[in-house]
Amino acid sequence: LAAALHECGHLLALRAFHVPIEGLRLSAFGAVLHARGVQRLSYGRELVVTLAGCGMNLVCGVLTAWFSLHYVWVEGFVFAGAHILLCAFNLLPIPPLDGSHALNLAVSALFGPLVGDAVAALAGVLCSLALLGGAVYLYVQTRGGALVIFAALALLLSALKELRLARRAIKV
């Protein structure tokens, strides 16, 4: 439910900017919306669309937590936590997560797309290495969380691919 509402946040922002939606693709890391005119959005508007999913999760998480507190709905805290965790995870600057795209857009708006690509790719590698280190530490300490190691490795591979593409673009 949290992932579906996250994508609804992106969808609502795209609709607000009158961008037609072509489709929705499910992947191992969640869902990806395909929109026809998103390339024509300004950096600022694309940043709004990128952060709208996390914004939706944050609003839903806070509202669910408030509702759970005031109406003694203990299970609601699980839903609130899922929204907040999904929001925080998606804000990590690791491709293909929203945080990486947001960082790329912000830096690109200031310094151009080549610098934006390079900064986002480097941040992605560094953050995914930190995530992998934390996952390995967790596994060594608790003998649990092996799936987190695999997820961190997948994110590291994605970040390394982006770094390779950014380096190639700078050389051209």
Regions found by a protein language model. Name each.
Residues 1-172:
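Hydrophobic transmembrane alpha-helices and their immediate loop junctions
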